[in-house]
């Protein structure tokens, strides 16, 4: 009863993110909750006075173009990160597909969070002594995702997809290419995995939402200075499998 919510869906389009955020700023809302990296970037660019809480954002320093990072943005932006347990996901790839000769990493080149995860997965595989060739397969958007996925499926023994908004929106398309080709897909989070993967080690997004909501209450009630609020993460991690694809 104390809060009015204005929920808008950008439908995966960056231009829509900008339009929605600009409308919020013109209305002088009390807080902007930005779900995903593109929305957070639009909000951070549009206002330096309205508190902005991000959620489902993987890499805050990259999203906000910050050269130094200690967990606190130091401005009107904070929130929660959905950064996956990448070291453990690298271990999962090697455990499930131990004889892989080529591991493909499929992601959208326009998403800095995906680039960040890719770098860590590659270094983690190297540290674990992985002998497979690790190759990146990047698409720029929905127009070329099918062609790039087809190339990856033709060359790889296993494909890894990080937490990637474009891939999540096109998971069915990816599955329609990889499953007939017999190429297993291991994913960075549960939503993508349900659409096209065999397994993931994922955070609990419900818990992430709860944490973000608690931060919003603290900001709105004046109990916290957002410029001093550290970005938080979900604590629970769980393994998820899709049995019908694992067969």
At which residue positions do the language-model features occur?
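Glycine-rich, charge-decorated loop segments at or immediately adjacent to ligand/cofactor-binding or catalytic sites
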Residues: 63-71, 145-148, 193-202
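An alpha-beta-alpha
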Residues: 78-128, 225, 229-244
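Flexible loop/turn connectors
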Residues: 192-241
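Flexible, glycine-rich surface segments
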Residues: 135-144, 148-196
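Conserved acidic residues
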Residues: 30-32, 101, 157-158
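Short beta-strand elements in bilobed, periplasmic/extracellular small-molecule ligand-binding domains
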Residues: 1-14, 76, 122-142
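Beta-alpha junction/loop-to-helix N-cap segments that form part of ligand/metal-binding clefts
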Residues: 6-66, 164-188
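Hydrophobic alpha-helical segments within soluble ligand-binding/sensing domains
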Residues: 60-102, 203-224
């Amino acid at each position: 009863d104390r809060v009015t919510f204005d929920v808008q869906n950008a439908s995966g389009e960056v231009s829509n993110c900008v339009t929605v955020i600009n409308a919020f700023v013109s209305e002088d809302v009390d807080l902007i909750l930005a779900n995903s990296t593109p929305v957070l970037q639009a909000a951070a660019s549009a206002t330096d006075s309205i508190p902005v809480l991000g959620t489902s954002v993987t890499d805050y320093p990259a999203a906000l173009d910050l050269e130094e990072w200690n967990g606190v943005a130091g401005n009107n932006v904070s929130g929660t990160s959905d950064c996956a347990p990448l070291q453990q996901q690298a271990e999962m790839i090697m455990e499930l597909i131990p004889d892989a000769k080529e591991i493909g990493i499929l992601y959208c080149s326009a998403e800095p969070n995906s680039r960040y995860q890719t770098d860590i997965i590659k270094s983690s595989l190297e540290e674990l002594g992985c002998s497979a060739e690790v190759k990146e397969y990047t698409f720029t958007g929905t127009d070329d995702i099918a062609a790039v996925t087809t190339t990856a499926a033709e060359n790889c023994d296993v494909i890894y997809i990080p937490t990637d908004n474009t891939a999540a929106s096109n998971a069915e398309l990816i599955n329609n290419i990889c499953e007939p080709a017999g190429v297993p897909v291991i994913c960075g989070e549960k939503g993508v995995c349900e659409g096209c993967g065999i397994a993931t080690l994922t955070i609990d997004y419900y818990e992430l939402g709860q944490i973000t909501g608690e931060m919003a209450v603290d900001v709105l009630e004046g109990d916290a200075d957002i410029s001093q609020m550290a970005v938080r993460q979900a604590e629970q991690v769980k393994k998820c499998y899709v049995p019908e694809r694992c067969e």
